Every structure is written in C-alpha cells, then in structure tokens.
UniProtKB/Swiss-Prot annotation:
Keywords: Ribonucleoprotein, Ribosomal protein. Transmembrane segments: none annotated. Gene3D superfamilies: 3.30.1320.10. SUPFAM superfamilies: Ribosomal protein S16. GO terms for cellular component: cytoplasm; small ribosomal subunit. Pfam families: Ribosomal_S16. One of its GO terms (molecular function) is structural constituent of ribosome. This is Small ribosomal subunit protein bS16. The keyword Manganese does not apply. It comes from Chlorobium luteolum (strain DSM 273 / BCRC 81028 / 2530) (Pelodictyon luteolum). Residues 171-181 have a biased composition (Low complexity). Belongs to the bacterial ribosomal protein bS16 family. The gene is rpsP.
Length: 195
C-alpha cells in the first residue's frame, strides 16, 4: 500500500519536510517512491508546494495521504478539485468551481486576519485603560483633604443589670446497672480459661 506522507529534512530545530509517496511499511525517513512536494512549517505563513499532477496521479492509483498531508492537500484545494472531477464535471465547470473556492478561501483568510487584528487592538486598549486610570487616580490621591472638626460626643455607660434565667431542672433518669452483654461474658470466660 502506498502512502503520501511527510519525510523530514532540514537541520536541528529547523524542520523542512518533503511530501513523498512511499510504501506504508518503509520508515519515516527511509526509502520512498517519489517526492511530490515540500512543506515548511516554520515559515509564516506555512509554505506548501505540491506537484498537483503527481499528487493527483498517486491518489487516483490508490495512495492514501496521512492526516497531516491530507490537511495540507485540502488547503491547496486539490482534494476539492479531484472530487469534482470524480463527480464527472467538465474542465470548465471544475475551473469555475475552483475559482469560487479560491475567492471563498481568500474571504475566510481575510476574516480571520481581521478578527486577530481586532483582538490585538482590544488587548492594547484594555492595557491602556489601567494606565489612564492610574494617571487620573494619582492627582486625586495627592490632593489635600480638608478635615472637618470632630464633634465631641458624651458617652453614657448604663449600669449593669443582672438577669437570672430560670433554669428548669431536668431530672436525670437513673442508669440501671444492666447485665453485661453476652459477648463480654464470653470474652471473660476465654480469658479465664487461658490462664
């Protein structure tokens, strides 16, 4: 079975991947059949280059992409194009649909960037608000406060009153010395027998 997957290249802490068609039993960086593209995850935005014809060929011959490669191929629109061709659409219809898809993706990307920039702007505003509040609070705290004269108040202490509460005496029921429980008797017998 053939897989379309990533093959690591590049140096330490700077990964660059080749997108390859390889036998599913081959190790990750081992033998492969063909290089069909490149992927650079460290670039901003990520760079994906595909040989669309070769990827389409391998997928039509039964090659299965891994989940990561599938998402990369999906972002380029190749999966959508292959699906349209499989449904029997003409080349003109496929080209028209792909153009619509590209526009839709551009709108999504722009919307996502707008949301990110709006969040950054709100964060900056929120960070600026406490600074403004501190600037306003500083002069208010430094302003001298006029103290009003305190009126003297006479404190009258009331004499102590003793109140005796009527406590009802509850007669306690006499505890009758009951016979020890049978378990206790059995234990006493065992102790006496051992000695």
């Amino acid at each position: 079975m053939v897989k379309i997957r990533l093959r690591r290249a590049g140096r330490k802490k700077l990964p660059v991947y080749q997108i390859v068609a390889a036998d599913a039993r081959a190790p990750r960086d081992g033998k492969f059949l063909e290089v069909v593209g490149h992927y650079q995850p460290t670039a901003k935005p990520h760079v994906v280059t595909l040989d669309r014809e070769r990827v389409a060929y391998w997928m039509q011959t039964g090659a299965q992409p891994t989940s990561t490669v599938r998402s990369l191929i999906q972002k380029t629109g190749l999966l959508y194009e292959l699906r349209l061709k499989k449904l029997g659409r003409s080349e003109a219809e496929v080209a028209e649909e792909m153009e619509k898809w590209q526009e839709k993706q551009a709108e999504r990307r722009q919307k996502r960037l707008n949301v990110k920039s709006r969040r950054r702007q709100l964060k900056k505003e929120a960070a600026a608000k406490p600074a403004v509040a501190e600037e306003v609070a500083a002069p208010v705290a430094a302003a001298p406060v006029a103290e009003a004269p305190v009126a003297e108040v006479e404190v009258v202490i009331a004499p102590e009153v003793q109140v005796e509460a009527a406590v009802e005496a509850v007669p306690e029921a006499p505890v009758a010395a009951a016979e020890p429980a049978p378990e206790v008797k059995a234990e006493e017998k065992e102790e006496g027998g051992e000695a």
